[in-house]
């Protein structure tokens, strides 16, 4: 699958950062001629790019006519996922029939081993990490890459026998036909409305993961994840209740027994799973379905699931003080993720005191407000869109505004009782107040540690 990039013209990388830099390394190693365009004056990765090749053609700053001409005459544009396809100069290239791809497309042209792709509004990183652990437990040299952190083109250096890719909607936009060994969509809820004109556009980007797949795994409980019916494509569904229709291979949770099941077989009991919440039961079911598609034994899958304790900042246990549990779900950067955490944890605690807020990315908080009214005893809000969230909560739910994470944690703890949960699950991005969701989670943990009992 080599040699698919044209060599008589420049390939243009639009957007540097971690992904763009990985593309530059990939093209440089293959002797391809390329140029780099980034609208930022000092984009991350600029020094590394110069160290790679100090003569590389590049433009940092506002895109003007010379850069537009370059794009309109490119052999191919490799677009970083952080760059909005609605940008004027990208739209001009599309109208000029210039091929626009992403690093995932380049990776899939190159790779010769099985590739599993995982998308969804929530749970992608957790499921990707767990699926990689399952692959390793089954004896494959396995590599997790993509949106989880390691750029896929850098992952080629791992020479893995099995790749597990976390794929965002932005990455899927720039792949023509993924053709994955297994394609999985966990769930779909409103997110990134600052990057999409309509919710349906976001859903359509997610659906691209199924194009050309050999096996598809989807959430029976979420109609938006339903894949198209294609002859020869094996379908596996998962559900938090036993499906009424038995026409397809289904992996489900039996509330009566606490068992995760496949047909009439018990796979594992919920008590053997270390990660919190019903939403993580769904995630584990998805992993069993994907492992089945890869012909990985259930024994290997069970062993990996039992050992997996989750990822930082995803429903992560922090401490228990004065009988009050603290959980860090800072990675809940959208409404759907926070709703999954609240609904999934509410049955395990007397009350929930929720810390939320931040950059809402133009989300609609109406459904979030209804869930808060039903399950949250006290809502502590912070960040840019605190007011937008407060407007969607009824007057019967106590709402407190906090200016810092320390203040939010102290307010929550002072209002909490034994058996309660203080949950950081913001339903928003973090960049209005923090360096990222990791920084937000660390500040939460530090504030909890600083509490006096």
Swiss-Prot record:
**Keyword Ligase (UniProt):** yes
What pathway does the annotation place this protein in? Answer: Cell wall biogenesis; peptidoglycan biosynthesis
* Top-rank EC class of the record's enzyme: ligase
Give the GO biological process terms. cell division; cell wall organization; peptidoglycan biosynthetic process; regulation of cell shape
Q: Which controlled-vocabulary keywords does the entry list? A: ATP-binding, Cell cycle, Cell division, Cell shape, Cell wall biogenesis/degradation, Cytoplasm, Ligase, Nucleotide-binding, Peptidoglycan synthesis
- List its EC numbers: 6.3.2.9
Pfam families (UniProt xref)? Mur_ligase_C, Mur_ligase_M, MurD-like_N
**Name used for this protein in its record:** UDP-N-acetylmuramoylalanine--D-glutamate ligase
What organism is recorded for this protein? Teredinibacter turnerae (strain ATCC 39867 / T7901)
